[in-house]
Design a protein with these regions (language model features):
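Acidic/aromatic/glycine-rich contiguous surface patches that form carbohydrate-binding/processing clefts
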Residues: 215
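Extended intrinsically disordered or low-complexity regions, especially N/C-terminal cytosolic tails and loops
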Residues: 1-207, 219-299
Length: 299
């Protein structure tokens, strides 16, 4: 692909409102639209304008009946969806961290295993992990970390304390790099998964978690990572083919984990509540297949 100059000048929110109107977007309240462009930004909102464009989208002309109100509806729905997903992934992140930290300490007999290079396959990855972990430890102002630094002589706390500084992606990185395949299998089995699937699903959840943390669009995004399939599934799962790059499949993964760590979870109720508040949302854009509610996972 040949590169070219950016070639676009800055436009004020007022000028952007006029530009959108000239392209066919219906704006009933120019002042309110200008306020949203000032507080949210045109670039962020453009992701929610994109589905309303005519084909070919490169012409930047809007479909008949496309409104700025619809843009804001999509924006608000995505925001609510991110909050829902992040709150549910948090529970999984805590449970997975506990399993990896404690099960590894128990099996290896090393409560400081996070800093033991002998337990890891790839030493370059381990070194990078230690650099990251050391920085997190040194700059942490958490009470439990400050207490350990004041009280004990060891350079680092035990894994179940130090691990509290690690986000899901880092926990998965440590897990993937473990030498002991039997240990990895044992940890994955805690969640009724094979080790490669466990790794893959954690990677997908990490992407979704980070998207939620950074307020990125999730509702109709196509993920770059395609999660592995689990063969011989022993727990309720989905049977209707679904696009594994869409957020629906991610939500299935979230529900699967929740059903293990919190069997009485109310994720489905939260989803119904969200969808009822945004009846205009086309669930197919999120990857939901027809009949999804009848799947064993969602019963």
């Amino acid at each position: 692909m040949t590169k070219r100059n950016f070639g676009k000048d800055y436009k004020t929110p007022r000028e952007l409102v006029t530009l959108l109107e000239n392209r066919g977007l219906i704006i009933n309240d120019r002042q309110k639209a200008q306020l949203y462009l000032e507080s949210i930004g045109y670039y962020r909102l453009s992701a929610y304008m994109h589905p309303l464009l005519k084909t070919p989208k490169i012409l930047h002309l809007y479909k008949e009946g496309a409104t700025f109100n619809k843009v804001m509806m999509l924006y608000r729905f995505d925001k609510k969806l991110r909050l829902l997903l992040f709150n549910e992934i948090e529970k999984i992140e805590i449970a997975v961290r506990e399993a990896v930290m404690n099960m590894t300490a128990e099996r290896t007999g090393d409560i400081y295993w996070l800093t033991n290079s002998a337990l890891f396959r790839d030493q370059s990855i381990f070194v990078n992990s230690m650099v990251m972990l050391s920085k997190e430890y040194e700059r942490s102002t958490e009470d439990f970390i400050e207490h350990f630094k004041r009280t004990y002589t060891e350079p680092f706390p035990p894994a179940w304390i130090l691990g509290e500084l690690l986000p899901m992606g880092s926990v998965n990185m440590y897990y993937r790099n473990l030498k002991d395949k039997g240990l990895k299998k044992q940890i994955a089995k805690r969640f009724c998964l094979h080790a490669p699937v466990f790794e893959s699903w954690l990677s997908v959840l990490t992407l979704t978690r980070n998207a939620c943390c950074h307020h990125a669009r999730v509702w109709n995004k196509v993920n770059k990572i395609i999660p592995n399939d689990m063969r011989g599934m022993t727990r309720p799962w989905i049977t209707i083919p679904a696009d594994k790059r869409r957020i629906y499949y991610n939500m299935c993964i979230i529900k699967y984990f929740l059903d293990i760590i919190s069997p009485n979870n109310d994720m489905l109720d939260k989803m119904h509540n969200l969808f009822s508040k945004f009846p205009e949302i086309d669930l197919a854009a999120l990857g939901f297949p027809v009949g999804w509610e009848n799947e064993p996972l969602w019963q």
